[in-house]
Amino acid sequence: MFQPNLPKHFHTSKNIRLFYLPSEPPALRISVAKKNFKLAVDRNKIKRQIKEIFKINNLIAGKGLFVVLVYKPFGELKYHEASVEIVKAVESLYQKGI
């Protein structure tokens, strides 16, 4: 059976998949597929929202790289719902001991 080669620390939901990789300096990478969001305006809006959520909630506290993969249902979320989703994902990673 095929086993995907995923990093040790990750969180998956129907809206996003969040990976954490130890690295220096801290960074945030966001991937929004053109397949799911045809217009560049929509892709850029989602990226701006995610960056703002990480910045406001001070989620990049330590060393490491966060990689966020965005799925189609994320585009339908309100800003507050998206914020709650991302904060929960990062908190679950911190609880796993990153």
What feature does the model see in each segment?
Residues M1-I98:
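Positively charged, solvent-exposed patches that mediate nucleic-acid binding
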